């Protein structure tokens, strides 16, 4: 999806993952009302270490379909009750 591709471009440009070739982007449309989500997950197998049967989530990016603003839980200590941050982070 174009949304997942956009997130992938930001993640790679900002070097938010150690091994970009070992990461997948899972697009979940309308995960929340008017919010699309892209889960950034570990890709295992081939040259990537880890159990090929699993794809643990690293973090997620939440995209508002109306405003196209993005937030992520990349910096949240508590994935459930924490506060999402603007994505990409403004340095």
Predicted regions and their residues:
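C-terminal partner/receptor-binding element of secreted or periplasmic proteins
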Residues: 67-91
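Context-gated lysine
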Residues: 8, 13-15, 43, 65-69, ...
């Amino acid at each position: 999806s174009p949304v997942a591709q956009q997130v992938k471009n930001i993640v790679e440009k900002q070097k938010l993952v150690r091994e970009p070739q070992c990461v997948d982007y899972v697009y979940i449309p309308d995960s929340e009302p008017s919010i699309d989500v892209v889960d950034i997950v570990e890709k295992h197998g081939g040259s990537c270490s880890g159990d090929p049967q699993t794809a643990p989530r690293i973090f997620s990016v939440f995209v508002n379909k109306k405003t196209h603003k993005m937030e992520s839980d990349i910096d949240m200590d508590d994935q459930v009750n924490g506060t999402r941050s603007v994505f990409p982070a403004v340095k």
